[in-house]
């Protein structure tokens, strides 16, 4: 897999029935918990939190939230450590947000759901401390990744965390195997998502193209990587 696949995933172009959408996000939630995807994102926030004050309110925008697993995990993680973490869970898909809302329970107090495009956010720039996403960038073209990183940079005053798959043959084989017992959407999109994923050097190069050389790549268990960092001398949000 020397190059990324440009084949479109089924869920990029179609909206399956709600029960299929729910099954997809339930599967992804389990994979993230069991194979370290959630831990990879929380590890980067753990590093950032060394500079936070006890009880500090921290605003996070979780882009392409899907089933909301990462948004809920961030709220729980923050509260467990004495921080007031508030997460705006953003997705362009209404069916994804329906699935996320159905799965929100005690975490709802720290969550706010918004159905919108990250490039057309109904808020001013710099309103969030951090912008995060998971399993989003492999859906995008290289040029769209650059544009999206620049949007993240405009929205976040402190930092960015991007979590995604690493393109490897071994990961492709595991994805093919794990999705066999599930629905046709997962059997198609799961392995394809690995073929569409980046290698670490490719994603780092796109960050440089976006003018965000302060973002660094880290590899994690479960064939995951994060592209993340905090801006030196955190930018202040513009006055309203």
Model-derived regions: residue spans:
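A conserved beta-strand element that flanks and buttresses the S-adenosyl-L-methionine
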Residues: 132
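A short, conserved alpha-helix within the catalytic core of class I
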Residues: 140-151
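Core SAM-dependent methyltransferase catalytic element
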Residues: 216-240
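Class I SAM-dependent methyltransferase SAM/SAH-binding core
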Residues: 59-61, 67-120
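C-terminal alpha-helical "lid/dimerization" subdomain adjacent to the S-adenosyl-L-methionine
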Residues: 165-210, 216-218
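Class I SAM-dependent methyltransferase Rossmann-like catalytic core
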Residues: 14, 18-44, 48-49
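Conserved beta-strand signature within the Rossmann-like core of class I S-adenosyl-L-methionine
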Residues: 156-165
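N-terminal auxiliary segments of SAM/dcSAM-dependent transferases
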Residues: 1-14
């Amino acid at each position: 897999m020397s190059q990324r696949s440009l084949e479109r995933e089924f869920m990029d172009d179609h909206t399956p029935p709600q029960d299929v959408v729910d099954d997809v996000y339930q599967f992804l939630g389990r994979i993230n918990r069991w194979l370290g995807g959630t831990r990879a994102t929380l590890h980067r926030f753990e590093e950032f939190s060394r500079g936070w004050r006890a009880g500090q309110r921290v605003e996070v925008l979780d882009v392409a939230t899907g089933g909301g697993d990462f948004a809920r995990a961030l709220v729980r993680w923050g509260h467990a450590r004495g921080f007031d973490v508030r997460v705006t869970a953003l997705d362009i898909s209404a069916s994804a947000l329906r699935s996320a809302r159905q799965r929100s329970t005690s975490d709802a107090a720290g969550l706010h759901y918004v159905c919108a495009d990250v490039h057309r956010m109904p808020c001013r720039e710099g309103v969030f401390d951090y912008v995060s996403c998971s399993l989003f960038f492999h859906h995008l073209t290289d040029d769209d990744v650059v544009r999206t990183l620049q949007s993240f940079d405009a929205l976040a005053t402190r930092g960015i965390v991007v979590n995604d798959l690493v393109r490897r043959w071994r990961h492709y084989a595991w994805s093919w195997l794990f999705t066999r017992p599930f629905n046709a959407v997962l059997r198609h999109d799961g392995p394809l998502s690995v073929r569409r994923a980046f290698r670490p050097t490719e994603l780092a190069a796109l960050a440089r193209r976006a003018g965000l050389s302060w973002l660094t790549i880290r590899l994690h268990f479960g064939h995951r990587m994060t592209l993340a960092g905090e801006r030196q001398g955190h930018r202040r949000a513009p006055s309203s």
